[in-house]
Amino acid sequence: MTIGYRDAAGDPLFPWLMEIKNSMEDLYAGKNSGYDLDKLLFDCISTYKKDSRYRNDLRFLKIWFLYLEGREDFERVYREIEETEICKGHSLLYEWYAIFLEVKGLWRRANSVYQTGLSRKAEPFDRLKEAHSLFLQRISKRTKASSLEKVGDDAQATDLETGFVNPWETSTVNGLIHKIKPQLVKYDGYHVSNKVFPGKANLSSLQNYSRNKIIEIGGRKYQMKGCAGQGGFAQVFKAFIDSNPDEVVALKVQKPPFPWEFHMYRQLDCRIPDSQRSSFGLAQRVHVYSDYSILVCDYLSHGTLQDVINSYVVVGKSMEEVLCMYYTIEMLNMLETLHSVGIIHGDFKPDNLLIRYPPENLTETGFHEKTGSWSKKGLCLVDWGRGIDLSLFPRTTEFTGDCRTSGFRCVEMKEDKPWKFQVDTYGLCVIVHMMLHNVYMEIEKKQSLDGGYINMPRTSFKRYWKVDLWKELFTKLLNRETCEDDTETLRNLRKSMEEYICSDPKLMKKLNELLAKQRISLCSS
């Protein structure tokens, strides 16, 4: 590291710079020990660390780093640099320390330093952003192969401080499926064949078949009742088992075969408490052939949250705030439960949230605890093809893939930063915005009280809303500086909204009326 100089007049740091320069030259020539240089650096720092003239002086920052590089307690030294706010607004503070950490193999910590600098808008900002992007590219290349070798291997997981992995990349998914294969074949309802689908029906053209067509899968006969959904690789059909209208299922037909989603469903069976299990979809069985896989799931007939939102859009109205808040509580509770057991959905959007209705009328009792009829009410999260099982990765793994779903790319994806739980919580924010405003969410940087910037929706809140609750939700979920567990944040947001609704009997009464009205409207359409 080289040190620059300027005129010594009125600059008491200048003689120290000259002495440090001479000491470094002597050290390289073998004329003194490193101890002499360390003492000189320490004395210089102690003399001027509280001198405001040098708080934003890059020469002084370089002296700090010369001292830091020779210390085993470098983290303590860096904390002191932060506490004394030396060059806090300059990108070189973060770039130099991140490079130092990267060389030591402390990649996760290095990434955190870059993120801190970016969140503070350190200048030159574009230089720091480019340095961070290049860092992610380097780490991605280094960890791509090694992270897959560590999947499911707890003994080796600690060897790698962190990995940056695309969880949806074909090679990643195939590696995971290979690792869990011994477990996969033991799952109840898992049926595999190395042959092509033996049925007479062409599964690729099922949508063209007439209603009531009978196809046989795994010894059972299914009466096709129509297409319920279609994606890039899969089609979902409504069907009756043995032509019995009381046994309705959803058949998800996918090519090429994709057993991963069934693994996610069985992990939900294992990890989610029985009292909440019906909120996350149920898979009965899967048939995996060499050309197709067919996933058999429970079928819910009451539409999706997207249908509810659309019912307001078509009449030019926005959803009532108390109903928005109710569905927000549902989603917060879902993600709190999922993330606490190490599961990420990865495709959290309104058309993957099915509506659930109880068989009997709702009562106010049990709203907080989701007991009685409330336990059968709410939402059901389905489509687990992009689900992430965190137990299969080292604990500190962070993700770099892009979901490429318009309107649902989280801030980290847009800014080329690693993410974890943000992929779900950003989806939640988009859905809440759609319920409140009838449009997708657009993000803008707004100045915060501490002089920095935070991500917030561009569209303003209406004055008569409970603005403090909505502002808190978007502020906390759109501005997470780390990829650490977010369950406490989700829980606190949920409880605040629950307490607000329960504080006024009129709100609870109105909510019941709106849910009853919604049920009549959707079921009759």
UniProtKB/Swiss-Prot annotation:
Residues 1-162 form the BUB1 N-terminal domain. ATP binds at residues 228-236, 252. One of its GO terms (molecular function) is ATP binding. The active site is at residue 347. It is found in: Nucleus; Chromosome, Centromere, Kinetochore. Its EC number is 2.7.11.1. Pfam families: Mad3_BUB1_I, Pkinase. It is an enzyme of class 2 (transferase). Disulfide bonds: none annotated. Residues 1-138 are annotated as: Necessary for kinetochore localization. It comes from the Eukaryota. It catalyses: L-seryl-[protein] + ATP = O-phospho-L-seryl-[protein] + ADP + H(+); L-threonyl-[protein] + ATP = O-phospho-L-threonyl-[protein] + ADP + H(+). Autophosphorylated when the cells enters mitosis. One of its GO terms (cellular component) is nucleus. A motif (Nuclear localization signal) lies at residues 50-57. Serine/threonine-protein kinase that performs 2 crucial functions during mitosis: it is essential for spindle-assembly checkpoint signaling and for correct chromosome alignment. Has a key role in the assembly of checkpoint proteins at the kinetochore. Acts as a substrate for anaphase-promoting complex or cyclosome (APC/C). Necessary for ensuring proper chromosome segregation. Can regulate chromosome segregation in a kinetochore-independent manner. BUB1 N-terminal domain directs kinetochore localization and binding to BUB3. Part of the mitotic checkpoint complex (MCC); interacts with CDC20-1, CDC20-2 and CDC20-5. This is Mitotic checkpoint serine/threonine-protein kinase BUB1. It comes from Arabidopsis thaliana. The lineage of its organism: Eukaryota, Viridiplantae, Streptophyta, Embryophyta, Tracheophyta.
